[in-house]
Amino acid sequence: MSSASRSLARLAALALAALAAAPLAASAQPKAARGKTEVTWYGHAAFVVTTPGGTVLAIDPWLSNPKAPEPGLAGKLPKVDYILVSHGHFDHVGDAIAIAKRTGAKLITNFDLGSSLVAAGYPKDQAGMDTLGNMGGTIQAGDAAVTMVTAVHSSGFTDEKGTGHPGGNPMGFVIQVKGGPTIYHTGDTDLTQDMKQLPERFGRVDVMLTCIGGHFTMDPKAAAIAVGYVHPRTVVPMHFGTFPAIAGTPDELRAALKGKAEVRVLEPGKPVGF
């Protein structure tokens, strides 16, 4: 075999090896099964959304909450691209800083809270003007668009030393997945007339992740009214039962809805496709 033939043979072998490796590299990225968007509840208001394109969004990642399916989850998530924090309270900021340091996840929240989280240790280069915003703003997050929408609550942030910092305005999130569902995470909120505008602005909401616990947020009766404003295909209750004070239940939500919407209670740690 001539030197030219040997070179061509080596190139062909390298090309075949690259083609064989390509599926392995692709499979290392967490993509939702069969082109669906996977939503995993980790208890309280904490969710991880994985899009068909492999973008991973962690919402209000208090993964050490009492309903979490196992301990140490903040150190076990294989990939997080973006962390969405609805407001500054400890049970929503949760493990955001630890997850960000380990995964390189960018922060999506209001500008004031973002600045306070950076001061508390969130990596500054992962919390810039490209992902910090405010009410009404839309952030492109891979193959998902995240819009910050109204929530009626409070948002003070207290760091590990007990020092208070500005938390900006609380918010919910509307996540529009390219070629996939529109997901509305209410954040912590009371019933608000602004919810009526969501279908006009975003079209049909496929999945509404709604607080129902009461005391600090809507109770099941108010959440049922909110569902009537938004008209989602599926309602997923959250922010209930973590503490004795937030005593609203999914059964109470179902009763208040009177069959007007599907209520789907997720099992912590088990992904569900939409």
From Swiss-Prot:
It comes from the Bacteria. Transmembrane segments: none annotated. The keyword Hydrolase applies. GO terms for molecular function: hydrolase activity. Keywords: Hydrolase. InterPro entries: Metallo-B-lactamas, RibonucZ/Hydroxyglut_hydro, UPF0173, UPF0173_UPF0282_UlaG_hydrolase. The keyword Hydrolase applies. Belongs to the UPF0173 family. This is UPF0173 metal-dependent hydrolase Adeh_1068.
